[in-house]
Amino acid sequence: MAAPQLFRALVSAQWVAEALKSPRASQPLKLLDASWYLPKLGRDARREFEERHIPGAAFFDIDRCSDHTSPYDHMLPSATHFADYAGSLGVSAATHVVIYDGSDQGLYSAPRVWWMFRAFGHHSVSLLDGGFRYWLSQNLPISSGKSPSEPAEFCAQLDPSFIKTHEDILENLDARRFQVVDARAAGRFQGTQPEPRDGIEPGHIPGSVNIPFTEFLTSEGLEKSPEEIQRLFQEKKVDLSKPLVATCGSGVTACHVVLGAFLCGKPDVPVYDGSWVEWYMRAQPEHVISQGRGKTL
């Protein structure tokens, strides 16, 4: 079951390099650099893109393509906003979109944009396995500059099954209708290491399971095999035959859980879009599980 999905979800650096040499008019290829970093890292993703990127790529700004009326970071935008933004980058209904980022891990933020395209009904979307890090390690071509795109017409319609809300997670504390997997680092989940955002304490949602997103990746930054990922879920006592929801700090690395499940033949994992930032800000103190100080009124 995983083999045909693997091709759609992940494409290799060599595949992309060959596709750029031999473009197909029937299904144009569009590369998007979806690099995004936590502010405290001090990295400027757009500037890094302009310094070097895969030829023909456009920069996808996760913060720009988000709901600016929300108090929480980069929540999903409206379908109209997403359609306008994707179209401005040259994406049409016929486009095969391939997404990557420039993180040191291989892939970090790109799975968020892969998930966004699928949530808005565009399933011809893949991730560059290993990201820009692996592309560079293979000495493949790079370009520099702003790389303007020819605008295209793109339509989007949100599939609500891709998202869970705060209310859904709160109700599930008692109902236990779905499992919750948190992709943050273990210390943040346990409450022993600080959150990277001011005013947010570490900890986790009651009953959630921790699988740090880096556990889905090899030391080279490539995605682990479906068999290895299945074992990872099994070791964490996550049952892929039952409903599952992904969360993290702000909805970015949660999409690694979605991708991992997808590669194992489970394409129906939604994301709690507000994730830990929203949960912490809205939760009662007893709903913040932490080995640290947790939350007090």
UniProtKB/Swiss-Prot annotation:
Modified positions (N6-acetyllysine) in chain numbering: K40
Residue numbers annotated as active site: C248 (cysteine persulfide intermediate)
Activity regulation note: By oxidative stress, and thioredoxin. Under oxidative stress conditions, the catalytic cysteine site is converted to a sulfenate which inhibits the MPST enzyme activity. Reduced thioredoxin cleaves an intersubunit disulfide bond to turn on the redox switch and reactivate the enzyme. Inhibited by different oxidants, hydrogen peroxide and tetrathionate.
Keyword line: Acetylation, Cytoplasm, Disulfide bond, Mitochondrion, Phosphoprotein, Redox-active center, Repeat, Synapse, Synaptosome, Transferase
Keyword check for Acetylation: yes
Rhodanese domain mapped to chain residues: 25-144, 174-288
Catalytically driven reaction(s): 2-oxo-3-sulfanylpropanoate + [thioredoxin]-dithiol = [thioredoxin]-disulfide + hydrogen sulfide + pyruvate + H(+)
Statement: the UniProt record of this protein carries the keyword Iron: no
Modification after translation (UniProt): The N-terminus is blocked.
Localisation per UniProt entry: Cytoplasm; Mitochondrion; Synapse, Synaptosome
EC number: 2.8.1.2
Sequence positions bearing Phosphoserine: S35
CDD domains: TST_Repeat_1, TST_Repeat_2
Effect the entry attributes to changing C255S: Little change in redox potential
Annotated tissue distribution: Expressed in liver, heart, kidney and brain. Localizes to tubular epithelium in the kidney, pericentral hepatocytes in the liver, cardiac cells in the heart and neuroglial cells in the brain. Also expressed in vascular endothelium of the thoracic aorta. Weak expression in lung and thymus.
Class in the EC hierarchy, top level: transferase
General function of this protein: Transfer of a sulfur ion to cyanide or to other thiol compounds. Also has weak rhodanese activity. Detoxifies cyanide and is required for thiosulfate biosynthesis. Acts as an antioxidant. In combination with cysteine aminotransferase (CAT), contributes to the catabolism of cysteine and is an important producer of hydrogen sulfide in the brain, retina and vascular endothelial cells. Hydrogen sulfide H(2)S is an important synaptic modulator, signaling molecule, smooth muscle contractor and neuroprotectant. Its production by the 3MST/CAT pathway is regulated by calcium ions.
Complex and partners: Monomer (active form). Homodimer; disulfide-linked (inactive form).
Identification of the protein by name: 3-mercaptopyruvate sulfurtransferase
Organism: Rattus norvegicus
